[in-house]
Regions:
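Structured alpha-helical segments in the cores of large, soluble enzyme domains
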Residues: 3, 92-100, 124-132, 157-160
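Beta-sheet entry/capping signal
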Residues: 32, 91-93, 103, 137-141, ...
């Protein structure tokens, strides 16, 4: 993931005493990293962007999008820091997919987070179990841009019911 590459670069920059400008120029060479100060933006009269051009040789002409293709391989912590006080969202959160198929014109996230990628039922179930066992939470918020569009929703819920039966499992959707 790009965060690790940026962190590694930052550690190298600190170790070698780089100035901020050198760090930013090096970071811009990592795929998926956009450094605004390394680009000149020109605008049309109506305020829309006319062009974006690099102002130094280290900045690529076009910044490539980076995505995590296989969500099953994304790091997910098995143990969380849990507060000692009651908080508003006193539950753990589990992401089941990224992206959205609907393509609503008003939704920026639906376009930015493409393509749609899903975790497998087994990975979701294992992560949910581990979260409950290691945090003491008895609620999990299953999240995504559109959870009801998860293609394996029914098998996922059936699998989770195997171990949540005495505790119950609820799913609320705005269309219900």
């Amino acid at each position: 993931e790009v965060n690790l590459e940026i962190t590694d670069l930052y550690m190298q920059a600190k170790k070698e005493g780089w100035d901020k400008q050198r760090f930013l120029q090096q970071a811009a060479q990592i795929g998926g990293v956009y450094v605004p100060s390394l680009y000149d933006v020109s605008y049309r009269e109506d305020g829309t962007i006319d062009s974006v051009k690099p102002n130094c040789p280290q900045a690529p002409e076009k910044v490539t999008k980076r995505i995590i293709a296989d969500l099953d391989k994304v790091y997910y912590p098995k143990q969380f820091v849990v507060p000692f006080i009651n908080i508003v969202h006193d539950r753990s959160m589990l992401e089941i997919q990224r992206g959205c198929l609907r393509g609503c014109r008003f939704c920026q996230a639906g376009f930015i987070c493409r393509p749609v990628r899903e975790k497998s039922v087994d990975v979701i179930n294992a992560q949910a179990k581990a979260t409950c066992e290691n945090t003491g939470y008895d609620e999990i918020s299953i999240s995504s841009l559109s959870t009801s569009d998860y293609t394996k929703l029914e098998p996922m819920l059936e699998k989770m019911l195997e171990w949540t039966e005495p505790k119950h499992l609820s799913l609320i959707h705005i269309s219900e």
